[in-house]
Regions:
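Basic amphipathic alpha-helical segments that dock to polyanions
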Residues: 59-69
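Pre-recognition alpha-helix immediately N-terminal to the DNA-recognition helix
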Residues: 26-31
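Long C-terminal interaction/binding lobes of large macromolecular proteins
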Residues: 32-33, 46
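Non-DNA-binding regulatory cores of transcription-related proteins
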Residues: 68-143
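Short, Lys/Arg-enriched N-terminal segment that forms or immediately precedes the first helix
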Residues: 5-17
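A short acidic, leucine-rich amphipathic alpha-helix
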Residues: 42-48, 59
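Short capping segments at the starts of secondary-structure elements
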Residues: 21, 34-39
């Protein structure tokens, strides 16, 4: 039942993004929401196993449409752009050793206070921010 709800939501997401709900695009959306901060290439490689004729352009176009509508966020990281389905205020915890990225809402109150203070002190209206905190994840710090 939960899978049917997810599929219905993915189909709605595609429609709202102005895209036809094809099996290939559904697979792209499913993969983006299943993985943790994937790159377009990672999504492409996984979806291509199910749909060998899918083009990389389909993946990029689908991701671009989802990004433009605010359903996912592009995160440029050095050599690759990753996609984050968590578009709410949060920090990205980036492991320096394995590269894993985790979302953390632990400091959301501080982020909101910072945005409020900036607007109050400068008349600048922040619309978004990106906070990346680098260190070692629990797995790497335990090794």
């Amino acid at each position: 039942m939960a899978e049917q709800v997810a599929e219905t939501n993915y189909m709605s997401l595609l429609r709202e993004a102005g895209l036809r709900s094809t099996p290939q695009r559904l697979a792209v959306v499913r993969e983006v929401f299943r993985r943790n901060h994937p790159t377009a290439s990672e999504v492409f490689e996984t979806v291509r196993q199910q749909f060998p004729t899918i083009g990389l352009a389909t993946v990029y176009n689908t991701l671009r449409s989802l990004t433009e509508r605010g359903y996912v966020r592009e995160l440029p990281f050095g050599d690759a752009t990753r996609f984050d389905v968590n578009v709410t205020t949060h920090a990205n915890l980036v492991c320096n050793q394995c590269g894993r990225i985790e979302d953390s809402s632990a400091a959301n109150d501080l982020l909101e206070a910072m945005r409020s203070r900036i607007q109050q002190d400068t008349s600048f209206r922040p619309e978004s921010q990106r906070v990346d905190i680098y260190g070692l994840c629990s797995t790497c710090s335990a090794s």
